[in-house]
Structure formats: C-alpha cells, structure tokens
C-alpha cells in the first residue's frame, strides 16, 4: 500500500491551508478525549480520512493506521501522534483567540494531529511511502499506552526508515528523549500528639530533609551526538497527616526521575535508589527507557534541512522511545510549544500549524 499517490495535484494556497488547519485543530480540541476515553475522536478521525479517500483501518485499542503500513520499494516514513489529552482544567471546549486555538490538547497534541490529517488528505506526490499512526493513552504510564502493543501487532510498521512524532517542539527537530521513572518514596517516623512534638518523630521533617537533598542536586548535563540532555529527579507530590492534631508517622512523596538516554532501566533504578534510600523506602511505579538521537540517519539531516533550524535534545519522554524499542529510529517535530503543554492556557498558533505543515510537506515531497 502506498502512503501517497503519484498523480500531480494542485497545491492549496497558504490562506486556505491555514484556515483549514485552525478549523481542524479546533474541531479536534472540541472532541473530548481524556486518556482512556478516545473512542469518539478515533471514530471521527477514521470517518474524516475515509471521506477524503485515504486508505485507513481501525487497528484496535484506539489505534488507527492510514497510508502505508510496511516498507515497499521506496523509503518508508511514519508520521505518528496521540489522540488523548490530560484531564481538563476548565479549558474545554476550545475557542479561537487571535490567530490560533486555545483549549485542552491544542499544543499537546491536537494541533499536530490536525497537521497529520491535512497531509494525509492532500495525497501529494512524495519521495517516500508514508504511513500515519494514531493512537491513544499516551498520557498514561507507558505500561498502559497503546503504541507499544500496536508495534508488536503491526510488525510492518517496524520496517520504517524513520518515524516522526508530532509532539510539541515549536517546529524544531528534537531528537532522542529522556528515560522516565515514577516512584513512591515513603518516609517513616513516629506519630504523636501535636501538643507534645518532642515525643514524636515527624515524618514530615524526614520528608522535607530527603526532598530538600534531592532538589539541591544540580541537573546533570550530558552531551550526546551534539545535543545536551539534563538528568534530573524531582518530587512532584507530597502527602502526610491523618488529623490536624496528630504529628504524622508516615509521609509519602512521588518522585519523577528523568534520566539519560544512555542508561538502561536497571541502571536508572539503581541511581534513583542511591539518591533516595538513605531517607526512605522507594517503590517504583513505572520505568520507561529513553532513546538516543538518530543523528546518523540520512533522513534526520533531510528533516533538519526542511525545518531550517538546529536540532535540539528532547528534554522529556515521548513515544520516540517506544519506536526505538521496536527498532525504529524516530524524532519529534510538531507545531505545539512544549512550554504550553498541559497548561490551563494551552494553545497553538495558526502560524505554527502552517509552518509544521510546510516543513513536513517539504520533507516528504519529491
């Protein structure tokens, strides 16, 4: 199956393209799709592609495949994106503001999905066989995500020469990604009456000491293939107390460790335990390895040239790691601004949507 036709088509004008991208993004934002509830948006995307004459199939478990699904005689490129969002923060449905879309998922990553859909519907001539991969539950821990199992089921996808994940990057090629551990850190003291604190051993004090030491450690910066990654561990939640007049004997923190792409999961776990276990007990909830930048891939240079900007390291975990685990080299490039992802005022500009389309169209064209 070919991802794009070889029949010449008339390119749409920039104003028309921009309007369609904005309308498409708002349309997608207005379909609620919090992780685990992607059925409506999945059905909508399939219907839109079928109506536009794009070969598409429901691959099960909130996954859809359009265009090419395995390598043919030409190089094989995948465009990939997730359909789900984090929970709403009084920012749904979306709205048009100025020259862009404001609303849940606009940046991460319904703007990117809108670009994917418009590229697929254009069916423009290409130097590649192009496939489109859409999936759900990306915002959940990787063990619950849909992409990894899809790559196991649809082995032809693993023949791709490059996968481009349209995560928010502000239209810069961001290569590689950090590994990601979430863990529960439990601090144990001795409960007591708040009127006699000298008879207790406050777990809050123990937690503050441990978290303070963890946060005092400077990020560890590492250059890989010319790109700088920062390894860092932070506490993202702290819970303690059973009553207002009881000094707690137990406190719990959630620790998030973003680790070097060079580390395997076991090495990262040992490093986090070394940092934490002098103060409390650590229980891992999830551990997902990162991915190294595919700088030697010739398609990387082609995409960078199309973007017109120097590449950056991806200071986050993204599905490029799942592609890498399946043997597919992958990079991130999308219209959203990563600084706006998951924010209450999340948004994406019309200019960024158009620029993302132009970069990918230039990369894919003959």
Language-model features and meaning:
Residues 84-97, 160, 175-186, 331:
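Acidic-glycine-rich active-site phosphate/pyrophosphate-binding loop
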Residues 27, 33-73:
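A non-catalytic alpha/beta surface segment that caps or lines the substrate-entry region
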Residues 2, 16, 168, 175-176, ...:
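Metal-dependent amide/peptide-bond hydrolase catalytic core
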Residues 74-134:
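Active-site metal-coordination/substrate-binding segment of hydrolases
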Residues 114-182:
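Acidic/histidine-rich catalytic neighborhood of metal-dependent amide-processing enzymes
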Residues 45, 113-123, 150, 207-210, ...:
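Buried hydrophobic packing segments
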Residues 39-43, 113, 266-270:
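Short, surface-exposed alpha-helical segments at coil->helix boundaries
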Residues 9-39:
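N-terminal capping segment at the start of a domain
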């Amino acid at each position: 199956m070919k991802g794009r036709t070889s029949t010449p088509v008339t390119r749409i004008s920039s104003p028309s393209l921009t309007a369609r991208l904005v309308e498409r993004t708002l349309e997608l934002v207005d379909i609620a799709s919090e992780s685990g509830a992607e059925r409506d948006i999945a059905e909508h995307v399939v219907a839109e592609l079928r109506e536009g004459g794009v070969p598409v199939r429901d691959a099960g478990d909130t996954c859809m495949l359009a265009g090419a699904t395995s390598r043919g005689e030409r190089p094989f490129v995948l465009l990939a994106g997730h359909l789900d969002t984090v929970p709403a923060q009084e920012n749904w449905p979306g709205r048009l503001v100025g020259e862009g879309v404001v609303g849940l998922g606009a940046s991460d990553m319904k703007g990117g999905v809108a670009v994917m859909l418009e590229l697929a519907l254009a069916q423009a001539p290409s130097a590649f066989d192009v496939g489109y991969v859409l999936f759900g539950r990306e915002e959940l821990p990787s063990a619950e995500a849909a992409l990894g199992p899809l790559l196991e089921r649809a082995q032809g996808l693993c023949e791709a020469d490059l996968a481009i994940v349209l995560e928010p990057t502000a239209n810069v090629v961001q290569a590689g990604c950090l590994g990601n551990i979430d863990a529960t850190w439990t601090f144990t003291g001795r409960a007591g009456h708040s009127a006699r604190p000298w008879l207790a051993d406050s777990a809050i004090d123990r937690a503050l000491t441990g978290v303070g030491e963890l946060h005092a450690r400077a990020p560890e910066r590492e250059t890989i293939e010319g790109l700088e990654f920062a390894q860092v561990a932070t506490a993202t939640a702290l819970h303690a107390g059973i009553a207002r007049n009881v000094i707690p004997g137990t406190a719990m923190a959630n620790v998030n460790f973003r680790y070097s792409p060079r580390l395997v999961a076991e090495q990262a776990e040992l490093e986090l335990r070394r940092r934490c276990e002098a103060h409390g007990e650590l229980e891992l909830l999830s551990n997902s390895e990162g991915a190294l930048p595919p700088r030697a891939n010739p398609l990387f240079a082609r995409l960078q040239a199309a973007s017109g900007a120097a590449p950056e390291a991806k200071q986050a975990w993204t599905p490029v790691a799942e592609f890498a685990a399946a043997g597919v080299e992958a990079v991130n490039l999308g219209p959203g601004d990563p600084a706006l992802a998951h924010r209450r005022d999340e948004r994406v500009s019309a200019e960024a949507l158009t620029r993302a389309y132009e970069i990918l169209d230039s990369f894919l064209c003959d």
